[in-house]
């Protein structure tokens, strides 16, 4: 049974699963150890997302959507920022894009932020498994109320933020310098996300 996200999962079975994964010979001719382990991790993220349904959207964007967004932006080199980074899929695909085009992973610098603590930890693990260095801040936090990268000017902003959020606003944000084009409507965060993206572009 699919119980990846269930609190009652048997810790002994989980330990055995990790032992099994640890014993896999990561010596593929085509893929390095980090790539194989990363694919295993991505598989479980996908399975977890499927079992959780709509609720999983807070941390998981389908790989096909992520690939399309990255291919459109073509982040060959520079600073890549995702203010609602979920489990870090945008960063993984950006790094894959760079290496697929003859570059090196460190041709891009990765910056992100995630609101949910558990999802922030998923992102850190996802990137660590793949050897991708990233600055996701020292904690999970709200990009609107506590921007962890206030001075960042990125070459690329790539994100799938939570759309149509109605409770994003507070009076503390009224005169925020990010609202160059006017204060976004309090009842819908979409325009706030767009202005947040523009604010962080170089």
Region locations from a protein language model:
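Non-catalytic, mostly N-terminal accessory regions of nucleic-acid modification and defense proteins
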Residues: 1-76, 135-148
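Short, solvent-exposed loop/helix junctions and linker helices
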Residues: 11, 151, 187-191
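Alpha-helix N-cap/helix-initiation motif
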Residues: 16, 55-58, 112, 182-186
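Mobile active-site "lid"/loop adjacent to the S-adenosyl-L-methionine
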Residues: 163-192, 196
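Helix-to-beta-strand junctions that scaffold the AdoMet/dcAdoMet cofactor pocket
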Residues: 201-202
């Amino acid at each position: 049974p699919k119980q990846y996200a269930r609190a009652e999962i048997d810790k002994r079975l989980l330990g055995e699963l990790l032992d099994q994964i640890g014993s896999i010979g990561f010596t593929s001719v085509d893929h390095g150890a980090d790539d194989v382990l990363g694919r295993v991790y991505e598989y479980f993220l996908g399975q977890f997302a499927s079992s959780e349904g709509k609720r999983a959207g807070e941390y998981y964007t389908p790989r096909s959507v992520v690939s399309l967004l990255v291919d459109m932006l073509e982040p060959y080199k520079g600073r890549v920022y995702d203010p609602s980074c979920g489990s870090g899929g945008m960063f993984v695909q950006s790094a894959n894009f760079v290496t697929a085009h003859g570059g090196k992973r460190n041709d891009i610098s990765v910056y992100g932020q995630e609101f949910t603590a558990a999802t922030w930890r998923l992102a850190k693990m996802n990137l660590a498994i793949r050897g991708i260095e990233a600055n996701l801040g020292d904690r999970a936090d709200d990009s609107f109320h506590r921007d962890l990268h206030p001075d960042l000017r990125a070459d690329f902003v790539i994100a799938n933020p939570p759309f149509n959020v109605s409770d994003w606003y507070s009076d503390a944000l009224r005169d925020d310098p990010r609202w160059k084009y006017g204060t976004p409507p309090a009842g819908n965060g979409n325009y706030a996300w767009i202005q947040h993206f523009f604010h962080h572009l170089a």
